A protein has these predicted regions:
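Conserved active-site alpha-helix within GNAT-family acetyltransferase domains
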Residues: 99, 111-130
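Short beta-strand-to-coil "C-cap" segments at the C-terminal boundary of structured domains/repeats
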Residues: 134-138
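Extreme N-terminal starter segment of soluble prokaryotic enzymes
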Residues: 1-3
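Conserved acetyl-CoA pyrophosphate-binding loop and the N-cap/start of the following alpha-helix
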Residues: 80, 84-92
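Acetyl-CoA-dependent GNAT
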Residues: 5-67, 72, 77
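Short acidic/glycine-enriched loop/turn segments that link adjacent beta-strands
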Residues: 65-66, 128-132
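Conserved GNAT acetyl-CoA-binding A-motif
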Residues: 97-109
């Protein structure tokens, strides 16, 4: 497995990954992906197995609070879920946050992912219109 930054050449594979997820927010995630890949402020991480994209993470710097990162999207191809790819990408983002001297990483998640992100060291901070607002602080 290789963890690397996403390049424009990866976009089609990532859009196919989003289609495989079959969630109701596919169009929203496609728009997030396209916008994020066009921004120089985006942190993008790709987990690649045998040349195939199996998971990716997008994050950006919080504009009002420059010392924080916000996870925009974490997606794992269904056939690879439960195998640690999401955890590896989150760990890589934490390492980057420490290197870049960021204070915290924020993510909004649905209630069914609360225990997953708690296991990754995030804590429940508040509820928002986008789900449960969670934070990891270094």
């Amino acid at each position: 497995m290789i963890i690397r930054s996403i390049t424009p050449a990866d976009q089609e594979q990532l859009l196919l990954l989003e289609e495989e997820l079959h969630d109701n927010e596919g169009k929203e995630h496609r728009a997030i992906l396209e916008e994020a890949l066009g921004s120089k402020e985006t942190i993008s991480l790709l987990a690649e197995q045998a040349g195939d994209a199996v998971a990716y993470l997008l994050a950006t710097e919080d504009q009002p609070l420059k010392g924080n990162l916000i996870v925009l999207r974490l997606a794992v191809r269904p056939a690879f879920q439960g195998q640690g790819y999401g955890s590896i990408l989150i760990a890589a983002l934490k390492d980057l946050a420490v290197q870049k001297e960021k204070e915290a990483i924020w993510i909004d998640c649905s209630e069914d992912l609360l225990s997953y992100f708690s296991q990754q060291g995030f804590r429940d901070e508040a509820e928002s219109d986008r789900g449960i607002h969670m934070v990891w602080e270094r």
